[in-house]
C-alpha cells in the first residue's frame, strides 16, 4: 500500500507556514503546546455555541498563535465572521474574556483578531464542515461530495480530492469512497496544497472526511 504522508507537514518551510509562532525552552515547550491547544479548543467551543446559525459549523479555516513575553496574539481566519459578530458588537471582546478565563496568565495580555477569508470554500476545513452537515441530515454522500466540488469551483482552485470513510449511508460494512476533480499532485513539494481531516458523528457511527485542495504551484 502507498504510505501517505501528511501534505502540510511535508511542505513546511516551502509552501506551508507554521500556525504557532513562538520559541520556548525545552523544559517549558510542552506547556506551550498544551496552552495553544487550550486556546484553540476554547475558541472553537465559543464559536460553536454563539454562531447565529446553530448548525455546529464553525467556519474557522485556521487559528494562528503568536507569542511574545508579555502578549499572546491570536488571529482567527474565518469564512463567515458576520455570523459570529453581527448583532453582538462585543462578540470579540466576549471571546477574549472567555479565553483569558480559561488560562490564568497574570503577566500576559491576550489579543484576538478575526480576519475574513475572501474565498471560504477554497478552505478544506470549511468544506469538511459543510459535508459533515449534509451527512448528518442524511443527504446521500455522493450528492454532498458533488455539491462541495461545485462550491470549490467558485474559489477557482486547480483541483480537489474528497475522501469519506466509514459506515457510509448506514451500510453494515465500512468502506472508503473518494472523488477527484482536476489535478492534485501530492508528491510535488512546490505545489500549494491545503488539507484537512475531519471526524463527523452520524447516527450510524463515526465517519472520517479527508479533503485535499490544490491551490497553486509556486
Swiss-Prot record:
It comes from Buxus microphylla (Littleleaf boxwood). SUPFAM superfamilies: Prokaryotic type KH domain (KH-domain type II), Ribosomal protein S3 C-terminal domain. One of its GO terms (molecular function) is rRNA binding. The gene is rps3. This is Small ribosomal subunit protein uS3c. Part of the 30S ribosomal subunit. The keyword Chloroplast applies. Gene3D superfamilies: 3.30.300.20, Ribosomal protein S3, C-terminal domain. It is found in: Plastid, Chloroplast. Residues 43-118 form the KH type-2 domain. HAMAP family: Ribosomal_uS3_B.
Amino acid at each position: 500500500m502507498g504510505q501517505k504522508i501528511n501534505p502540510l507537514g511535508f511542505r513546511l518551510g516551502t509552501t506551508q507556514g507554521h500556525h504557532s509562532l513562538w520559541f520556548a525552552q525545552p523544559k517549558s515547550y510542552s506547556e506551550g503546546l498544551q496552552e495553544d491547544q487550550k486556546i484553540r479548543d476554547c475558541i472553537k467551543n465559543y464559536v460553536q455555541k454563539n454562531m447565529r446559525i446553530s448548525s455546529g459549523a464553525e467556519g474557522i479555516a485556521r487559528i494562528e498563535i503568536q507569542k511574545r513575553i508579555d502578549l499572546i496574539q491570536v488571529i482567527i481566519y474565518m469564512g463567515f465572521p458576520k455570523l459570529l459578530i453581527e448583532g453582538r458588537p462585543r462578540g470579540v471582546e466576549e471571546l477574549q474574556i472567555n479565553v483569558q478565563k480559561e488560562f490564568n496568565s497574570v503577566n500576559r495580555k491576550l489579543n484576538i483578531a478575526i480576519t475574513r477569508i475572501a474565498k471560504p470554500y477554497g478552505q478544506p476545513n470549511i468544506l469538511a464542515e459543510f459535508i459533515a452537515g449534509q451527512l448528518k441530515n442524511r443527504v446521500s454522500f455522493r450528492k454532498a461530495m458533488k455539491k462541495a466540488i461545485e462550491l470549490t469551483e467558485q474559489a477557482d482552485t486547480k483541483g480537489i480530492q474528497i475522501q469519506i470513510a466509514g459506515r457510509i449511508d448506514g451500510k453494515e460494512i465500512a468502506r472508503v469512497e473518494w472523488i477527484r476533480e482536476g489535478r492534485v499532485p501530492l508528491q510535488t513539494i512546490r505545489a500549494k496544497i491545503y488539507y484537512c481531516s475531519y471526524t463527523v458523528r452520524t447516527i450510524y457511527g463515526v465517519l472520517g472526511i479527508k479533503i485535499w485542495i490544490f491551490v497553486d504551484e509556486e
